[in-house]
Design a protein with these regions (language model features):
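Cysteine-rich modules of extracellular adhesion/ECM and protease-associated proteins
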Residues: 1-145
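Acidic/polar, compositionally biased interaction segments
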Residues: 119, 141-385
Length: 385
């Protein structure tokens, strides 16, 4: 009689990796999950790089297209590329050095170019230099809405609960709050594209007891500690590149990632795996999230975030969402209409970077839900005359 999780494959089981944890290739009912192969019973399953399905620790999967196309043979993005649509070609990364980004040939964004079909191949209508090839006609069209968007992310693991002789990071599991505390960061990113600390609600600072500025008391310890939240720092945090995969909601133009109330993507990894992080209810809390996405501004995009703890969203390097501090789930949205375009310095047709910074700083619930509406870009469609 088959017993899922015992390490032996007996029909109707299709796999058995000796556990009943879904998301690792073999489901909790011992069915094979898409994008994986399970060759040996009782052993971990492995992802299938090149099948066009983003699975496991893959950072991209363009369906096994040619080398040097942006997604490597090990399913990691190649330098200078972004791979945000599973199963489709990666595209060149726009150049952003302040203000509007500069579109580059191959990024799939038709800005100041005769055409751009998202690749650097010749003989497909749009050349490697983004010129329309002889005997072809290229039109700028709204890109066909993909089923998913896969946005690159970097998680950084901090020690929230000390274990195994480790030391807790000062900003983790220290403070409390009953709602958002705005003003922890300035209104613009620094030259490295990272948030700038204000110290407004610093522990021991002049505003700690100021209920107008800091209604929930101190929220941070120091600039030196804050500057490590989104910077790789040996011995303090462990970085993990990944993707946040947003699913299309019907034909609404909306894409949603919902991590639920137990969003702890580094459980079983980082300091937890090294035995230096004490778990809370079996989960690894104490991490930050850095997510970036390029978009051509059309004037009707909507972003909504719902979660905890600190969340800051910048567009064009300017602060658009400010729900910092320790708090339970808070929801905030921003519509990039006329009023917001002036505030953020956005011009229709130009390319900008969306940068989201998040921190989970207290064990318990962890909520993370991101909704992007209208952020799918235009591209070129070329046809033979």
């Amino acid at each position: 009689m088959p017993v899922c999780g015992d390490g032996t494959v007996i029909a109707p089981e299709k796999c058995d990796d000796k556990n009943t944890t879904p998301g690792d290739g073999c489901s909790d009912t011992c069915a094979l999950e898409k994008g994986w192969e399970c060759k040996t019973a009782s052993q971990p399953c492995t992802t299938v790089c090149g099948d066009g399905i983003l699975a496991g620790d893959e950072l991209c999967d363009d369906g096994g297209k040619a080398p040097s196309d942006g997604c490597s043979a090990t399913c990691t993005p190649e330098n200078g590329f972004v791979c945000d649509v599973p199963g489709q070609s990666c595209r060149k990364k726009p150049s952003c050095t302040g203000g509007a980004c500069t579109s580059v040939c191959g990024d799939g964004l038709v800005i100041g170019e005769a055409c751009d079909d998202g690749n650097l191949a010749d003989n497909d209508g749009c050349s490697a230099t983004c010129n329309v090839e002889a005997t072809y006609t290229c039109q700028t069209v709204a890109a066909a809405p993909p089923a998913q968007l896969a946005i690159p992310v970097v998680y950084r693991d901090f020690i929230s609960i000390a274990a195994g002789g480790s030391t807790k990071f000062p900003d983790q599991y220290t403070f409390q709050g009953g709602g958002a505390t705005p003003g922890i960061v300035t209104a613009a990113l620094d030259v490295d594209g990272l948030p700038v600390y204000t110290g407004v609600c610093e522990q021991g600072g002049p505003n700690e007891a100021n209920v107008q500025k800091c209604p929930y008391g101190a929220q941070t310890t120091s600039k030196a500690n804050f500057d490590m939240w989104y910077r790789d720092t040996d011995g303090v945090n462990l970085p993990f590149p990944g993707v946040v995969q947003l699913d299309r909601v019907g034909q609404t133009g909306a894409y949603v990632f919902d991590g639920g109330t137990t969003f702890t993507p580094l459980t079983g990894k980082g300091w937890d795996k090294q035995g230096k992080e004490g778990l809370f209810e079996g989960r690894n809390f104490g991490f930050t999230t850095e997510l970036r996405y390029f978009f051509a501004y059309q004037g009707d995009e909507v972003l909504e975030f719902s979660g905890d703890d600190d969340v800051w969203v910048f567009m064009n390097g300017k602060l658009a969402v400010d729900i910092g501090g320790l708090h339970s789930k808070v929801t905030q949205n921003v519509t990039l209409g006329v009023a917001k375009s002036g505030e953020l310095g956005l011009t229709v047709g130009k390319v900008y970077e969306l940068a989201l910074f998040h921190a989970e700083r207290r064990p318990g619930g962890s909520n993370f839900k991101l909704t992007l509406t209208g952020f799918v870009n235009n591209t070129s469609k070329c046809t033979k005359n």
